[in-house]
């Protein structure tokens, strides 16, 4: 009778390696998904869709109770008490605006906005894309008193969503178009920051502003003295955020202020603190901050709504501002800028593609919802406009995204521009 040979280490290793490989497959798949350009937008859509489902189901009371859950941070005699929704809007969104500030600084110092002539086309397009939607909203809500506070809601662009749509299109969206959209959205974000600072600031606390100024001076000093470690910036940034929160100025602006003090220039090893922080924050914002914000703010209950609800001044002003205003403002300003010789068309981009891009700029979503949460926050409960704001943002953003995507997806190849000759 022949003895069965014992299994050596290599014999055991094969099935063990196979089991480990199978166990790691979900993690590998998750990592591959997170590397997709459109992944952040997909997660944001899923979180927002979940909010809509919960808001129109028996779970609505639990959803609302979750957002109203009181959360407190107490350090000695100092304490901050807020419902969970405000921690998300004031706290997590400060991290988002920190990332926005880093992107703005990088683009102006060493990116596509560092050259004045290159920056002029996206700058003019962004300004047009803010002014025209605001005018449409004001025109629809003229004479409506407090409703005019929402004029800036359709002026915003959600860069994460817009770039996510372009990423889904692959080669049908040329790199130059992505660069142009990014530049327009960055300048649009800068405009939104200015609008929040100037028009959506409550009564000011002088003492808190003085302390915030001292914290900001400390951050500037760190930069001037060449401090490149991020820990000191984080500590002073947290102090600045608390002071700004207590001052009456919206706390998210603290994130922008911190970003502008982070060193950009690389060291002898070629490492830039700003670029490293931007890289580290990107996934946290794309897969954490924005989906949580979308989940907390996109819930719209359709109970009691009728077709006439769409025609309410706030809803109609936002929806038309995003869908009609953005495409007129962005495309019109871009066309005039090129027509008068102030800037050149980007290499390899057609007017049809720029028109589609102007539609994608009408995806206001997270930024529009955020400004909407500020525009009417001081009104009494019986005059709340949360539902009309959310409905208008959803209608305008979804319509803009759908039509912009369809144009780029089915644009005939013959409409694509021919490469410029070297002599032109």
Where are the language model's segments positioned?
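Structural signature of hydrophobic alpha-helical transmembrane segments
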Residues: 86-97, 145-160, 201-214, 250-257, ...
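Predominantly late transmembrane helices and immediately cytosolic-facing juxtamembrane segments
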Residues: 15-32, 36, 53-56, 69, ...
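Hydrophobic core segments of alpha-helical transmembrane domains in multi-pass membrane transport
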Residues: 43-56, 96-102, 132-137, 215-221, ...
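Transmembrane alpha-helix boundary signature
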Residues: 54-66, 79-85, 99-115, 131-152
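Entry/N-cap segments of selected transmembrane alpha helices
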Residues: 107-135, 205-214, 302-328, 351-355, ...
């Amino acid at each position: 009778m022949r003895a069965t040979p014992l299994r050596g280490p290599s014999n055991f290793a094969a099935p063990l390696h196979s089991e480990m490989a199978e166990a790691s497959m979900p993690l590998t798949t998750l990592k591959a998904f997170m590397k997709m350009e459109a992944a952040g937008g997909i997660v944001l859509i899923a979180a927002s869709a979940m909010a809509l489902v919960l808001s129109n189901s028996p779970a609505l009371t639990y959803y609302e109770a979750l957002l109203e859950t009181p959360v407190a941070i107490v350090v000695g005699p100092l304490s901050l008490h807020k419902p969970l929704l405000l921690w998300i809007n004031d706290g997590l969104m400060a991290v988002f605006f920190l990332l926005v500030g880093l992107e703005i600084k990088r683009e102006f110092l060493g990116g596509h906005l560092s050259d004045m002539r290159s920056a002029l086309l996206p700058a003019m397009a962004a300004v047009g894309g803010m002014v025209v939607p605001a005018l449409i909203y004001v025109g629809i809500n003229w004479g409506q008193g407090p409703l005019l506070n929402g004029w800036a809601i359709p002026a915003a662009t959600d860069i994460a969503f817009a770039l996510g749509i372009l990423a889904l299109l692959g080669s049908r969206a040329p790199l130059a178009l992505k660069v142009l959209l990014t530049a327009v959205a960055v300048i649009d974000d800068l405009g939104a920051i200015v609008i929040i600072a100037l028009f959506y600031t409550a009564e000011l606390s002088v003492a808190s502003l003085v302390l915030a100024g001292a914290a900001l001076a400390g951050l500037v000093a760190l930069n001037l003295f060449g401090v490149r470690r991020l820990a000191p910036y984080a500590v002073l940034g947290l102090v600045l955020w608390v002071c700004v929160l207590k001052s009456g100025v919206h706390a998210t602006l603290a994130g922008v202020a911190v970003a502008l003090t982070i060193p950009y220039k690389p060291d002898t090893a070629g490492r830039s603190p700003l670029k490293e922080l931007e890289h580290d924050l990107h996934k946290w914002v794309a897969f954490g901050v924005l989906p949580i914000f979308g989940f907390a703010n996109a819930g719209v209950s359709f109970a009691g709504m009728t077709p006439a609800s769409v025609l309410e001044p706030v809803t109609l002003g936002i929806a038309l501002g995003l869908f009609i205003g953005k495409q007129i403002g962005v495309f019109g300003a871009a066309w005039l800028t090129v027509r008068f010789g102030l800037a050149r068309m980007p290499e390899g981009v057609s007017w049809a593609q720029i028109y589609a891009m102007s539609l994608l700029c009408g995806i206001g979503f997270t930024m529009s919802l955020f400004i909407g949460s500020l525009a009417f926050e001081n009104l009494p409960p019986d005059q709340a406009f949360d539902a009309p704001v959310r409905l208008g943002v959803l209608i305008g953003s979804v319509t803009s995204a759908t039509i912009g995507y369809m144009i780029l997806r089915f644009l005939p190849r013959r409409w694509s521009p021919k490469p410029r000759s070297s002599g032109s």
